[in-house]
Amino acid sequence: MKTLVVLCTLLSIIFASPLSLKSPLVDDFYNPPRGYESAKLGEILKLRKTPGKISSLFIPVEVKNSWQLLVRSEDSFGNAAAIVTTVIEPFNADPSKVVSYQSWEDAANIECSPSYGMQFGAPLSSVQTQVDMIFIVPLLDKGCFVVLPDYEGPKSTFGVGRQSGKATLDSIKAVLKTKDFSGINDDAQVAMWGYSGGTIAAGWAATLQPKYAQELKKNLIGAALGGFVINITATAEATDGTLFAGLIPNALNGLANEFPDFKKRMYEVVEKRYEGALQQGTQHCLGGAILHFAFDQVFTGDHRYFEQGYGLLEEEVFNRTISGNSLLYMGQEYLPDIPIFVYHGSLDGIVPIPDVHGVYKNWCDWGIDSFEFAEDSLNGYLTEIVVGAPAAITWLDARFDGQPVVEGCKKTTRITDFSYPNISDSTRNFFKGILDSLTASQLGPGVTSDNVTLSGLTGFMGGLSKFKKSV
């Protein structure tokens, strides 16, 4: 009976007309007030409850509160900027625990911002944020406040490291000033977590923090980075002409949104017949880009967008911009001052692991205090998203519990990251989180929910599949 209720509810949601949410393009909340430039970094410029309910897989989830903050930040050049960050409070939240989750937005379009895409009623184009919300549910179920910054900022600068890192740090500064309405302690422990494109933000935040946000040293307890993106060129080479070729035009346009000289040169040298195709990289969120650009050859083949191919990346403006936003090429002054946990699949065909080995060697040679590297020999990019998540959650739990971190550097290669030590509870909570999101259960420690069983859910999914085939 429970399964039938869930099935009927889900079907009504799937086939109902989407709720009306204002796009960031027309929502005045995203526009900073006059004179905001004089505000301090991390200062809250505007505050509101999220217009729509938080949702996962386009199904509302029950949390106690959620807010959006407009926060003073800056771009790569130090120019004033205002970014939106979302704060989610679960039931029975622990005001001393905050996780800053950097979603894998991977788009050069502000309508792909997490603050918009995580709400019930968001368009189907926001599917990547809705899927990413699955990984946030277990954190909420553990009582952590979760913060999701629109780290690409108002210009949608996908791939731009400093913009993303600064926005992440400024959003954390802002959240630690919300005690009056959120209850979050100003001395709360804060951890960062991101996968793939989210590691551009979390990774750069970790490297910028010692100089850009020294005051956060007492709060930050570590960063978990999965599918660690540290070399934009390597990802372009790995994905050109593949199913994930859409990452390339999205990233090129994200860089162009921040660097005018890069944009000017890029559109000067693109083959005229492909100029419109390249511009489409500003129109699609990640899911749409994968579909639209599937198997396109941007740098290779007879129908490549750029006649020079990869040789174009050696031009001064291209080389300077791309290498300047790749952590692989950053010097010792970018060494993180907080514990780092990296989990990565050996078979990753989108974010190749050799460059991650390079960053591991560099940071360890330079004397990083704590760097734990979990390499999964059985999994690649897509499967490690799920397989590595319980390891990340386990590592985050240990940080919040005050357990000792790795001293210096430690790299372990396992057949699967499911065998990461002490992962059993985390695995159960992770998959329970997925179940809770599907059944719209109240989230928070100690909350009793009327959930369907796992076998019931399996049957429900099978029934849904048959239903869709019959209509």
Swiss-Prot record:
According to its UniProt record, where is this protein located? Answer: Secreted
Q: Which reaction does it catalyse?
A: a triacylglycerol + H2O = a diacylglycerol + a fatty acid + H(+)
| Keyword Membrane tagged | no
Q: Would I find Protease among this entry's keywords?
A: no
Active-site residue numbers:
196 (charge relay system), 348 (charge relay system)
What are the EC numbers?
3.1.1.3
Gene Ontology cellular-component terms listed: extracellular region
The record's listing under InterPro entries reads: AB_hydrolase_fold (IPR029058), Lipase_secreted (IPR005152)
Which protein family is named in the record?
Belongs to the AB hydrolase superfamily. Lipase family. Class Lip subfamily.
Q: What does this protein do?
A: Lipase that is able to hydrolyze both the neutral triacylglycerols and the monopalmitate ester Tween 40, allowing the use of hydrolyzed products as carbon sources. Has broad lipolytic activity, which may be important for colonization and subsequent infection, therefore contributing to the persistence and virulence in human tissue.
Name of protein:
Lipase 3
Q: What does UniProt list as this organism's lineage?
A: Eukaryota, Fungi, Dikarya, Ascomycota, Saccharomycotina
Which gene underlies this protein?
LIP3
